[in-house]
Swiss-Prot record:
Residues 1-21 form the signal peptide. InterPro entries: UPF0319. Keywords: Signal. This is UPF0319 protein HAPS_0727.
Length: 213
């Protein structure tokens, strides 16, 4: 029995539906790579209509002046975690026009996240690091591993990003207290996490289902 199949069934038991309204956009030098644990495809509209915790992975690119020549800069993926809004949200990265700008941004990236009415939203950020050859080629798995951990911008409820399902935060029936997950791979850890998140009745239904597989 594959853990992925079990985990997908588990998420189906506790997932809800969400209606969308406001949109999330970025300045011209911002590219969205992931949103709430899911891969973002080109020209995808990112939408929220609540004040729940949300997470994006962005990449910043810019053509800048290097001596008498022009050069191209592309940042490593950066995770931004913030509370949503029913208004449109804009994520603004600074203009990077010189080697000094690039060096400062690499050292300490800064952003502005604000609503269309001008309200500034606080956020947490961290670099999303990959491993092995071409570490940034698998953003979603890297993000799932990050969210399972204790990084400053981690959101455990988005750890199921490798599953082809959009999760909704179930705030009515969750177990309270610290959740501890152990396992040899991401799928096993994700399964443990969501099992502990579920209420007792959901856990029982899931175990009954698993025994029949």
């Amino acid at each position: 029995m594959k853990l992925g199949k079990i985990a997908l069934a588990m998420t189906a038991l506790i997932a809800g539906t969400t209606a969308f309204a406001g949109t999330i956009t970025g300045s011209s030098n911002v590219t969205f790579l992931a949103f709430d644990g899911q891969k973002v495809r080109r020209n995808t509209n990112l939408q929220v209509n609540d004040t729940n915790l949300h997470q994006v992975v962005v990449e910043i690119s810019s053509i800048y002046q290097s001596g008498s020549d022009s050069a191209f800069f592309e940042s490593q993926p950066i995770i931004l975690t913030f509370e949503g809004s029913t208004e449109d949200i804009k994520i603004l990265a600074p203009s990077l026009n010189s080697e000094f700008d690039i060096a400062q941004f690499k050292k300490s990236p800064s952003f502005k996240i604000e609503t269309v009415s001008g309200k500034k939203l606080t956020y947490k950020q961290d670099f999303l690091k990959g491993e092995g050859f071409m570490p940034n080629s698998n953003i979603i798995n890297n993000l799932a591993n990050y969210n399972i951990g204790e990084g400053v911008a981690a959101v455990q409820k988005f750890a199921l990003s490798t599953m082809p399902i959009t999760m909704a935060n179930n705030t009515n029936k969750v177990n309270k207290g610290k959740i501890v997950v152990q396992g040899e791979n991401v799928t096993e850890q994700q399964l443990q996490y969501w099992f502990q998140q579920a209420d007792k009745e959901t856990q029982k239904r899931f175990l009954d289902w698993a025994k029949k597989q």
